[in-house]
Amino acid sequence: MPGVEVFDTPLGSVELDQNLVNKIAHLPQIVISREAHDLEHSLEVQLPFLQSVLGKFTLLPLAVGFTSAEAVADVLAHVWGGEETLIIVSSDLSHYLPYSIAQRMDQETMQSIVQLQKLVEHDRACGSIAINGLIVAAQQHHLTPHVLDL
């Protein structure tokens, strides 16, 4: 967690959900690290879109480092809510490949996710640990993924 109370965007501030922050702060997987969030930009580029679509909401930003998918799923289990809870895992999938190869690899990765296969490899997706953690959580909650776009 970043150790801040708000994330600022050109559209205004998004407050952190302090109830959820307090709910998971004691977990051994959780570390307060502003540096981890300073080096990562995936959330910042999505926040204005989320503000436009959702209006006012609270946020629990988690940067996932080197850990197991099960450890990520355990943290998600502590914050799993009802329909009011939106869990987003961000990935830009393959990197620095010729377009046709990237398309094929990204399609294969997407199929692994949709089929809830948890072994998305590091070389196939930036954020593979977080993706795999969400796959484990989806399996535990008997969810069925649906592809919106790729």
Model-inferred region functions:
Residues 1-150:
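Active-site histidine-anchored catalytic micro-motif
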